[in-house]
Amino acid sequence: MTDFILKISPNIILGPYTVTRLGQNALEWGSRYMVIMDPILKETGTAEKITAPLAERKIEYFVFDELTQAADTQTLETILNLARNSHIHGIIAAGGGKTLALAKAACALFNEPHTSYDYIDGGAPTAGTIPLICVPTTIRDAFLFTDRVPLCDSRSGSAKIIKTQNGICKLVLWDPNLELTLTDKQSAAMGLETFSMALEAYLSRKSTFFSDMLIEKALQLMSYAADGSPTLTVTTPPEVLYTQAGCMASLGLASCSAGASTLLSLTINTRYKR
């Protein structure tokens, strides 16, 4: 086992209706935000649940939801231009993996003098970043707690992973109620991906007792959620259990190393843009 070095970042708030605290928490890092949002949230009526807490706290914001089917560099350049011209204090990302990836990359490159393609080709950002607040609407994200961002190179359509500065994401608000709009097939696919993430983290040569502890608990929670029927000892709703399991699996994977299944999933998502 490798040496154990513990540094918890970002702050994580997980539970039903935690999105209502978005406004009061966002004020800690600024009062003017760009909200990058998955367009499906507007169609399902979820978008207002995210923006309402900001309006209540008199936080200035504008929403960008013109996302393509992949977290590509062309969309990233559009986001960077809007963010820089708007003089924002930070970015709030609400959605799945591609939304969070674009927001994280935008925060990392906000003060950089070069385009995103210089970093796609191997450069490393060194300038200061702006704060990122993540509101995931899926149960897992393999790169959320790492200093890496998966992107699609618009020039070639290939998947690339760029390195970012540490400590970009300041807060993760994980609200299971935001995931209720997922279809049964989407939930099943994400559950399978979460299980694959947990398995490869547990078998990783870079695993630690901390990552093993998180993964074992994640698998236990997934088994409770899959059972579906409440018992005298387990009364937590399945959607909350799945969210807790996904969060722990993401943390466990980040504390060791991603493996073949994560990279295969990234490649498939980039290739078929789903």
Please annotate each region the language model reported.
Residues 1-90:
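ATP/NTP phosphate-donor binding region
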Residues 10, 111-209:
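A glycine/threonine-rich phosphate-anchoring loop and its flanking beta-alpha core
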Residues 19-22, 43-46, 73, 98-103, ...:
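Short glycine/serine/threonine-rich phosphate/pyrophosphate-binding segments
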Residues 50, 79-80, 99-113, 145-148:
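Short Gly/Thr/Asp-enriched flexible loops that form oxyanion-binding sites at enzyme active sites
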Residues 55-56, 82-85, 106, 123, ...:
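N-terminal loops that bind phosphate or other acidic moieties
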Residues 88-104, 137-139:
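Glycine/serine-rich anion-binding loops at beta->alpha junctions
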Residues 201-274:
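Active-site segments that bind and position negatively charged phosphate/pyrophosphate groups
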